[in-house]
A protein has these predicted regions:
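M16 family metallopeptidases and their MPP-like homologs
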Residues: 1-23, 45-51, 101-110, 140-245, ...
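An aromatic/glycine/proline-enriched structural segment found at the starts
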Residues: 10-11, 18, 23, 43, ...
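Short, charged, amphipathic alpha-helices and their helix-cap/turn boundaries
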Residues: 25-29
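Solvent-exposed, non-transmembrane alpha-helical starts
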Residues: 61, 113-117, 173-177
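Active/ligand-binding-proximal structured segments within catalytic/core domains
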Residues: 105, 115-127, 134-137
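PPIase-associated folding chaperone regions across multiple families
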Residues: 118-122, 140, 248, 255
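In a subset of proteins, long, contiguous C-terminal domains/tails are tracked
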Residues: 245-277
Length: 277
């Protein structure tokens, strides 16, 4: 993650992972940790959800009892610059403690509140979700140049990544893997996805969203997320329809807009002994 993010978002938000690095943790003193806690761990920067078969009045009394005395920090919300796209392809090779060669290609995409967000997620599923996906069918089944492949989105408030990955065999040629992936990306960017592909992706999304609401925990987590990012818990009732409303043209436009070579990072991972050779 850190290798992709530091290259994709250089000098931008998300250049480093939210959890930080061991260097960050080791350099932080007690005073810094206490100030961070006071600034961010406050009731005006938190969302409390109580879900389940509860008595509303009793739950409110308990909330006031245990949390009512906590004072707001009045911390101003951080402002972040917009993500910069199409800054030129970044390519690098990393020799690490891996047994098999692997390729990661990441395209910068808009945040989860952007109008293209759902189209981008469906696009990633058409590319690399399951054995019938374009990537698996071409790279694993037909060309047999990789053991595994797939695609997914890493989405955040103002930006994210559509990540394509592929793990090769011991003697796989990573340049061939990158070339094959690029060919599939180019094809989906210049020709429309099929109705069948889009319907399959939508069905998977609908199943995942509805199954996630089958438990009290799932409902509570969804409500908290919708309020945190959208200030709208009502989205829990129309989230599925927002995906179902995405058209083939929406997916096509997203592919053309974001799946560009100048908008991506290409990382090749090779075993350390390859460098020695």
């Amino acid at each position: 993650w850190s290798e992709l993010m530091s290259r994709a978002f250089k000098d931008q938000t998300y250049e480093w992972t939210p959890i930080g690095s061991m260097e960050d943790l080791n350099s932080a003193d007690l005073g810094y940790a206490q100030e961070f806690y006071r600034k961010y761990y406050s009731p005006d920067n938190a969302v409390l959800v109580i879900s389940g078969d509860i008595d509303y009045d009793h739950a409110r009394k308990l909330t006031e009892k245990y949390f009512g005395e906590l004072k707001p920090a009045n911390t101003k919300k951080n402002s972040y610059a917009e993500i910069i796209y199409n800054q030129g392809e970044v390519s690098d090779t990393i020799y690490d403690n891996v047994q098999l060669p692997a390729v990661y290609i990441a395209y910068k995409i808009p945040g989860l509140k952007h109008k293209d967000a759902h189209a981008v997620e469906l696009l990633s599923m058409i590319l690399g979700d399951g054995r019938s996906s374009r990537l698996h069918n071409e790279i694993v089944y037909k060309k047999k140049i990789a053991k595994t492949t797939g695609a997914f989105v890493w989405d955040n408030e103002i930006g994210g990544l559509l990540i394509v990955y592929s793990t090769g065999f011991k003697n796989s040629n990573t340049d061939s893997m990158i070339s094959a992936i690029t060919s599939i990306i180019d094809d989906i960017s210049t020709s429309q996805v099929t109705t069948r592909e889009l319907d399959k992706a939508k069905n998977t999304i609908e199943k995942d969203l509805t199954s996630g609401l089958q438990t009290v925990l799932g409902v509570g987590d969804a409500l908290a997320s919708y309020w945190t990012f959208f200030r709208n818990t009502g989205k829990i009732n129309n989230a599925v329809n927002e995906y179902l409303d995405v058209t083939i043209e929406d997916v096509q436009n997203a592919a053309e807009k974001y799946l560009k070579k100048e908008n991506r990072v290409v990382l090749t991972y090779l075993p350390k002994e390859k460098k020695a050779n």
